[in-house]
């Protein structure tokens, strides 16, 4: 499994453990490029999660889509093996925060 695949495996396990609805859009010729690896919904809030390994960063197109999603009110996270705790932070913010 690739390093990014391991990050995705951990994200998937976290989403399932918290019973959060999600899907993983597939980048096909009929899909849209730049969309995060995961689209989730928690208490009516849209969450995009981009998985990266190590110090890898989103592409310019991914960053543009992330900005568009944030402008529409979504949460967008870029998660790697070092910041998986951000998932818990977003859960707390959506459940208890001022959103």
Predicted regions and their residues:
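Catalytic phosphate/metal-binding cores of nucleic-acid and nucleotide-processing enzymes, i.e., regions
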Residues: 1-99
């Amino acid at each position: 499994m690739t390093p990014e695949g391991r990050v995705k495996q951990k994200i998937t396990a976290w989403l399932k453990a918290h019973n959060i609805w999600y899907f993983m859009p597939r980048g096909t010729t009929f899909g849209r490029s730049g969309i995060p690896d995961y689209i989730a919904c928690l208490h009516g809030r849209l969450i995009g999660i981009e998985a990266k390994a190590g110090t890898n960063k989103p592409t310019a197109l991914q960053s543009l889509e992330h900005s568009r999603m944030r402008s529409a009110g979504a949460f967008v996270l870029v998660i790697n093996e070092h910041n998986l705790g951000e998932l818990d932070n977003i859960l707390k913010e959506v459940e208890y925060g001022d959103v």
